[in-house]
């Protein structure tokens, strides 16, 4: 039996929050030196378990603050779980924040080489791919422009183009495609489908429930850090829609 591309077992993630009531920086410093500051845990995710098979698309839906982005960062190996186990097999290309992994002071060309290298590709290979990556993103004329001059849509196109061009085993997409226009969203969906046909796994966060129904094999509904429902996308989306009226 083939091991799943992603395996999460009873994973929880907590952030540590200070309960200091210091009114000034000096008071806070004194409390820190005297170890008078107490902390509490804020659980962003609690007891999450899931699997994603090779070539499967898992959609994650839920209200703002449900823990969706935290889950994506945990799967992308950005945030380790506080408790439980997370295993992601193979190469991972995360698109979890607009512009993440890019330097705004560097040009698109320089960022493509750097980003691809971070994802495991050789620099020389990425240099050979820069023109094609920029062309797919409709950024041919802007390849030598620093990213600080890019719009959010241009950043999204560049990020998706370079991430998918590296042919990852797992693609993690957290709503960043929503900033693109309809043509780009359709183009991105087609490329994702091609990747899936070739065996890549995708975890997708989206508030566009029509997209979820169109491309997802399974869906989970997150609410307050808990998996409220998992299963067929139609069932999960219907239950979520009923809950929000």
PLM features: residue spans?
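Conserved ABC ATPase "signature" region
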Residues: 26-34, 113, 125-142, 161
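A short, surface-exposed alpha-helical micro-motif characterized by mixed small hydrophobic
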Residues: 212-214
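Pre-NBD coupling/linker segments of ABC/ABC-like ATPases
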Residues: 2-44, 233-245
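Conserved ABC ATPase "signature" C-loop
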Residues: 224-225, 240
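The feature captures the beta-strand-to-loop junction immediately N-terminal to the Walker
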Residues: 61-63
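H-loop/switch region of ABC-family ATPase nucleotide-binding domains
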Residues: 206-207
